[in-house]
A protein has these predicted regions:
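Short beta-strand elements that form the blades of beta-propeller/WD-repeat-like
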Residues: 132-137, 177-183, 216-223, 261-270, ...
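Conserved blade-ending motifs and adjacent loop-strand segments that build the rim/top face
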Residues: 289-308, 345-369
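Repeated scaffold domains used in trafficking and secretory/extracellular systems
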Residues: 122-125, 166-171, 206-213, 250-258, ...
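A short helix->beta-strand "capping" segment at the edge of beta-propeller domains
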Residues: 94-120
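C-terminal motif of bacterial Sec signal peptides marking the signal peptidase cleavage site
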Residues: 75-77
Length: 403
């Protein structure tokens, strides 16, 4: 009878191992019922056998029985997973526009049109911290826009090959104290004060296309023949890298692949990728994956070329709140914007066009917690539904998500 019990234990352990891959509640309930039946079936003949033996042996066998029946549960405990940390899978499909409209109604929109005496060229990179907006235009000029004072300040740092000169600034980011401008030719980060004066130069020795300042370093995305995430320490030393996609867009887009979520953690989603990753301070972990019904195995996020051939050209923007995930894609014609909104609480995803919020369309670029921003020139304001904007104005749009 003892060896029969070992067999039962072995069967239960196998079932427990398979159970780890089960995510639905029905499977868990059926498993518990089956496990109870197996335990009872194995225990009953053993108890009858022990009754025919001495009291001392029955005491030993009883303890042995408890131990044997506890083994599968010990395996279950040691191999259990925290389902709250598992990747969230989103199946993109059409649904009622009611979900979209209700979510849009919960967003607050603020618009500032600020006059500038210095013409600003099309914006290449931007960041917003509080009432301060920092802009890098395609002419490699850096501007500070004070929203509260409605002033525009231009940096006096000149372009050149001298040590304290920028040769080819391509992106910027900011925190509560400094502005960080990355020079792609010199492969270094120029650290500026809020009045755009040079404070420090940090050598990186690596190339990337965009980055965000985060705790203890920089979250970066490099684009060459593929797209890779890099984490640099504050001293510019790269200490972590991960490939996110095997394809990159032919030209840079308006969206930002690195966003700061409501939880304060940075998230990254490469162009031509179906997976949003979260940086937990040590490594990237999968957070959200979009299923586009392509018949490919889940988690195959590196094969971005498959998305390029499926009619979805690239991700323009994505935003994560406590209740929703919004992503926008530009189709292969380069003009049609396709929105996907996922309702976490109701488990519903909606796909289609988005109505304006207070006559302003949602086309944000950058997310900082519960706020998302777009900075546009006057001639681009019509895309957002804004009218009668003076040509000497630069427009800042802030979208505030519900808490």
């Amino acid at each position: 009878m003892i060896h029969h019990l070992f067999v039962l234990d072995f069967v239960m352990i196998i079932i427990l191992q398979k159970r780890k891959r089960q995510n639905c509640m029905k499977a868990k309930i059926l498993f518990r019922v089956l496990l109870t039946i197996i335990c009872i079936a194995g225990a009953y003949p053993l108890i009858s056998w022990m009754d025919s033996n001495s009291y001392k042996f029955r005491r030993f066998s009883g303890s042995f029985l408890v131990l044997m029946l506890a083994i599968p549960f010990l395996f279950s405990s040691c191999n259990s997973r925290n389902t709250k940390e598992e990747m969230q899978r989103i199946t993109v499909k059409s649904s009622s526009d009611r979900i979209v409209s209700e979510w849009l109604d919960s967003i607050k929109v603020d618009v500032w049109a600020i006059h500038t005496d210095v013409p600003v060229a099309p914006i290449q990179s931007m960041d917003v911290i509080g009432n301060k907006c920092f802009v890098l235009d395609v002419f490699k000029r850096i501007f500070l826009i004070d929203i509260e004072k409605r002033l525009v300040l231009k940096s006096d740092i000149t372009l050149g090959n001298a040590r304290n000169e920028m040769l080819s600034p391509i992106c910027l980011t900011a925190d509560e104290e400094h502005v960080y401008v990355y020079d792609g030719m010199k492969e270094c980060i120029f650290v500026l004060s809020y009045d755009l004066k040079l404070c420090q130069i940090v050598n990186t020795g690596c190339f990337f296309s965009t980055f965000r300042k985060i705790d203890n370093g920089f979250a970066c995305l490099s684009m060459g023949s593929e797209q890779n995430f890099l984490f640099l320490r504050d001293d510019g030393v790269p200490v972590y890298s991960k490939q996110l996609s095997d394809k990159y867009p032919d030209e840079m887009q308006d969206g930002n692949p690195i966003q700061i979520g409501l939880d304060g953690y940075p998230y990254v989603k490469a162009y031509y990728s179906d997976t949003v990753f979260k940086w937990n301070g040590q490594e990237l972990v999968e957070s959200v994956q979009f299923d586009y019904g392509m018949g490919e195995p889940g988690g195959d996020y590196q094969k971005g070329s498959q998305l390029a051939h499926s009619g979805i050209a690239y991700t323009e923007s994505y935003f994560l709140t406590n209740t929703h995930v919004l992503s926008s894609f530009v189709e292969t014609d380069g003009r049609t914007i396709h929105y996907n909104l996922y309702d976490k609480e109701n488990g519903v995803s909606c796909s289609g066009k988005m109505a304006p919020i207070d006559n302003v369309y949602f086309r944000a670029t950058l997310q900082h917690g519960k706020e998302a921003y777009a900075v546009v020139l006057a001639d681009e304001a019509c895309v957002y539904g804004l009218k009668d904007i003076d040509m000497n104005n630069i427009v800042i749009i802030r979208y505030t998500f519900p808490s």
